[in-house]
């Protein structure tokens, strides 16, 4: 489809300014940037010709990965302010003809998110299949070196699998061990994510920048990757731009 300048969607022609709240502007002198600090700089951003503010994660988080480990998708971390502060920011941006796009991470959650806490609580938990749980390799005991379900190397360090000693099973985490991967094969997971996104859109958010969205679709066979250094393999061919990623994104757009 060809667009003219006049009818092109706003996101194709906007000037987007990313704000990393923690280091942008501190309003209360505690050494941490916050939403009220962002509010105080909107006139400056407007004068720069900014159309869209892209806000890096401000959700409630243990901050293991600078807010990309989300423990509550529908709340603001107290370090940055409150939901009321965010509502005020949305209104102030819209009053200036500007839009707000929020960073959103749905490949994984924090291990402190209620979804994972429930998933981890029992092998029979209704949310067990919301994450990727697997037993050790055939013929090996849980915790034994090399018993991880695959040889994939984490983006951070070590294996992508963390042993849960209580159940004897491992959970998948492409990033930090405190960032377990959601199982997008499960339609309940996708429905929960869609509902959360609608909640933010209803609150006035104009869109999302989807972090690491290209890794949400995994090869369900979970094959080993080629060993590139030491004992760990490169699993990226089995989870990057996976077989259902476009299906999931089209579904997200429809919902």
Where are these regions (language model features)?
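Acidic/aromatic-lined carbohydrate-recognition and catalytic surfaces
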Residues: 2-198, 202, 215-255
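A glycine-centered loop/beta-turn motif at secondary-structure junctions
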Residues: 203-207
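Hydrophobic residues within beta-strands of alpha/beta enzymes
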Residues: 53, 208-210
């Amino acid at each position: 489809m060809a667009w003219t300048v006049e009818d092109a969607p706003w996101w194709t022609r906007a000037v987007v300014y990313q704000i990393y709240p923690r280091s942008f502007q501190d309003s209360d002198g505690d050494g941490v940037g916050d939403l009220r600090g962002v509010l105080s700089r909107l006139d400056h951003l407007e004068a720069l010709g900014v159309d869209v503010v892209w806000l890096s994660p401000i959700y409630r988080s243990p901050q293991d990965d600078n807010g990309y480990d989300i423990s509550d998708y529908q709340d603001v971390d107290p370090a940055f302010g409150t939901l009321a502060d965010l509502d005020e920011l949305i209104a102030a941006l819209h009053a200036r003809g500007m839009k707000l796009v929020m960073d959103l991470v749905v490949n994984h959650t924090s291990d402190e998110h209620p979804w994972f806490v429930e998933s981890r609580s029992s092998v029979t938990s209704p949310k067990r299949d919301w994450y990727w749980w697997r037993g050790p390799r055939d013929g090996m005991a849980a915790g034994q070196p090399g018993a991880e379900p695959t040889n994939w190397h984490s983006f951070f360090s070590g294996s992508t699998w963390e042993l849960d000693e209580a159940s004897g099973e491992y959970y998948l985490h492409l990033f930090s061990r405190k960032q377990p991967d959601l199982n997008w094969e499960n339609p309940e997971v996708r429905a929960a994510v869609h509902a959360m996104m609608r909640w933010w859109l209803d609150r006035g958010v104009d869109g999302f920048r989807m972090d690491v969205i290209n890794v949400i679709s995994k090869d369900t066979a979970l094959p080993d990757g080629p060993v590139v250094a030491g004992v760990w393999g490169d699993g990226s061919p089995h989870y990057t731009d996976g077989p259902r990623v476009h299906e999931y994104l089209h579904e997200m757009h429809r919902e």
